[in-house]
Amino acid sequence: MMLTLALPKGRLAEESIDLMISKGWLSSKPDPNSKELIYNDPKGKIRILLVRSQDVATYVEQCAADAGISGWDVLKEGGYDLATPLDLKIGKCRLSLAAPNGFTLEAHHRKIRVATKYPNLAREFFFLKGLSCEIFKLYGSIELAPLVGLSDCIVDLVSTGGTLKANGLKELDIILESSARLVFNRSSLYGKRKEAVEFMDSLSKI
């Protein structure tokens, strides 16, 4: 049986597709100029759904896809009911607390204003620190928020730290180490067990 796999558009999809080609699950890459969001590989092993990164887990959880590849940060933020059997060790980054130079948590005595795309993980971080915070959920350009007075600090993904540095921000703490995870809904993990196990075993040999 064919596996339907949800992939996030962008760099992680490209890395995932390269990995599957190297393992013999795909014969070729989808046409980068195509507007089609479903790719049926000629080998007949995999059908790919190209979706937004935040939507991968929903497609899998609701059985619109058997499996998906998603960042650990997205999975932890959403709290999805999925099997997460494999860390693919690609798409590595970290979710970090960052702020302008001079800001410290210890010296902050009022409610801390935090801008982030990850309100649940940010709230949990400050709760465990015993600090009160006000969360502003943003969808992009998170680094801008403390520069214009919207927030005191940010919680955002960091790869190299170059964007933080360019905007006068420094990394204060790492909240979560993230990488791409292969996820399955439990129905497909049972109903397509042979294909699922073969797929996992193949990708685990990186």
UniProtKB/Swiss-Prot annotation:
PANTHER family the UniProt entry points to: ATP PHOSPHORIBOSYLTRANSFERASE, ATP PHOSPHORIBOSYLTRANSFERASE ATP-PRTASE
EC class (word): transferase
Function, in words: Catalyzes the condensation of ATP and 5-phosphoribose 1-diphosphate to form N'-(5'-phosphoribosyl)-ATP (PR-ATP). Has a crucial role in the pathway because the rate of histidine biosynthesis seems to be controlled primarily by regulation of HisG enzymatic activity.
Upper classification of the organism: Bacteria, Pseudomonadati, Spirochaetota, Spirochaetia, Leptospirales
Provenance organism: Leptospira interrogans serogroup Icterohaemorrhagiae serovar copenhageni (strain Fiocruz L1-130)
UniProt xrefs under Pfam families: HisG
Subcellular location(s) of the protein: Cytoplasm
Protein name as catalogued: ATP phosphoribosyltransferase
Known pathway: Amino-acid biosynthesis; L-histidine biosynthesis; L-histidine from 5-phospho-alpha-D-ribose 1-diphosphate: step 1/9
